[in-house]
From Swiss-Prot:
Residue positions of the active site: E212 (proton donor), K348 (proton acceptor)
Keyword Oxidoreductase attributed: no
UniProt GO MF annotations: magnesium ion binding; phosphopyruvate hydratase activity
Uppermost EC category: lyase
Compartments reported by the entry: Cytoplasm
Family: Belongs to the enolase family.
Taxonomy, superkingdom: Eukaryota
Gene name of this polypeptide: ENO2
EC number: 4.2.1.11
Residues bound to substrate: H160, E169, E296, D323, S375, H376, R377, S378, K399
The name this protein goes by in its record: Enolase 2
Species assigned in the record: Debaryomyces hansenii (strain ATCC 36239 / CBS 767 / BCRC 21394 / JCM 1990 / NBRC 0083 / IGC 2968)
Length: 439
């Protein structure tokens, strides 16, 4: 089924910044996709095209990307008479039209909007749910679908929050729940307990939420944050049933070959900055003291030696996730696999800028027996594409914020609907989240 019309506009994301929305029309109807954006972005990511005009939106406008869809992509796309059910041909066409290695001519945000809207149109063309179509084009097993474990970011630090805490995200991971809906209930109850404990201990304003819905109290150390979360898990009655995951986002505080855990202080003491090995030792202590099941971006994105050293120590105990390290880029993923630097991929569709390349990144990871965690960005929207993607890919893990803020819950609510629709044709990944593709 060919596309009769393609149109883009700008709308706003959850941080109040403009982003690209694409409407793609076929004989079956209109299919809409909105592109997310990140706060901490890896230097190896595909280029998100922003206007740079400081007099409007503080330079963050996307009118160029929108114009690229409407003036360059749309006429060529409609003329090419592409079949929406052939996703790889569509994405190949878009990449050739751009012609740069990092999508800097048209903008990854322009290309991705069209790519994702195409998949939605294809699902309608085939009269199947989006997750089913995504399973088809990614070659996933479909005897039973796997529902992901929701990694819920309940406490924010790093670049996502004020306060001194360097680590960016502390997540609860309900691995022992029997179903996705129960996992979400457990997460919600822990989250509410955490909010009330936080307000009690740090004052009313500490219960205010960060970009991704987590609380952001003025906490100084990772242990203080972990103790608070453990108390909330205990208070909710789930001791021993919920794991913890960290997204350190260490590239944000990697300076001159060292790690500055006091990076938000302009006068931080250089003598206290840690080497990669010292930081690895801190992680090992935390892994031994707390039920940590996954650590993302423990080191700087080009500090390969630290990653390899850490992998050799703990890869049998915890999942080591590459985000800034791998940026959903096949070349970076290949290097990380060869070097034995990580054992899981954080999959963000806007880091690579097309659906086909995102699926390829997941497949390469699965082939290396890596885990794959499908992820939102901190600048999110009401679009629920990644919920269907996590199910269609059989990823077994999704990271989409706290059980708060509608742009986060939109994804979690969509998985609830998918769970209901699939009934006994679905299983919850639970403790097998790392190897869900094999279930």
């Amino acid at each position: 089924m060919a596309v009769t019309k393609l149109f883009a506009r700008y709308v706003y994301d959850s941080r109040g910044n403009p982003t690209v929305e694409v409407d793609l029309t076929t004989d079956k109807g209109l299919f809409r996709s909105i592109v997310p954006s990140g706060a901490s972005t890896g230097i190896h990511e595909a280029l998100e095209l922003r206007d740079g005009d400081k007099s409007k939106w503080l330079g963050k406008g996307v009118t160029k990307a929108v114009a690229n869809v409407n003036e360059l992509i749309a006429p060529a796309f409609v003329k090419a008479n592409l079949d929406v059910t052939n996703q790889s041909a569509v994405d190949d066409f878009l990449n050739k039209l751009d012609g740069t290695p990092n999508k800097s001519k048209l903008g990854a945000n322009a290309i991705l909007g069209v790519s994702l809207a195409t998949a939605k149109a294809a699902a309608a063309e085939k009269n199947v749910p989006l997750y089913q179509h995504l399973a088809d084009i990614s070659g996933s097993k479909q005897d039973k679908f796997v529902l992901p474990v929701p990694f819920q970011n309940v406490l924010n630090g790093g670049s996502h929050a004020g306060g001194a805490l360097a680590f960016q995200e502390f997540m609860i991971v309900p691995t022992d729940a029997p179903t996705f809906s129960e996992a979400l209930r457990m997460g919600s109850e822990v989250y509410h307990n955490l909010k009330s404990l936080t307000k009690k201990k740090y004052g009313q304003s500490a219960g205010n939420v960060g970009d991704e819905g987590g609380v952001a109290p003025d906490i100084g150390s990772p242990r203080e944050a972990l103790d608070l979360i453990m108390d909330a898990i205990d208070k909710a009655g789930y001791k021993g049933k919920i794991g913890i995951a960290l997204d350190v986002a260490a590239s944000e505080f990697y300076k001159d070959g060292k790690y500055d855990l006091d990076f938000k202080n302009p006068n931080s003491d250089e003598s206290k900055w840690l080497s990669g090995e010292q930081l690895a030792s801190l992680y090992e202590e935390l892994i031994n003291e707390y039920p940590i099941v996954s650590i993302e971006d423990p080191f700087g994105e080009d500090d390969w030696d630290a990653w390899v050293h850490f992998y050799s120590k703990v890869s049998s105990k915890v999942q080591i996730v590459g985000d800034d390290l791998t940026v959903t880029n096949p070349l970076r993923i290949k290097t990380a696999i060869e070097k034995k630097a990580a054992n899981a991929l954080l999959l963000k569709v806007n880091q690579i800028g097309s659906l086909t390349e995102s699926i390829k990144a997941a497949q390469d990871s699965f082939d290396a027996t890596w885990g794959v965690m499908v992820s939102h960005r901190s600048g999110e929207t009401e679009d629920t594409f990644i919920a269907d993607l996590s199910v269609g890919l059989r990823a077994g893990q999704i990271k989409t914020g706290a059980p708060a803020r509608s742009e986060r819950l939109a994804k979690l609510n969509q998985i609830l609907r998918i769970e209901e629709e699939l009934g006994d044709k679905a299983i919850y990944a639970g403790k097998n989240f790392h190897a869900a593709s094999q279930l």
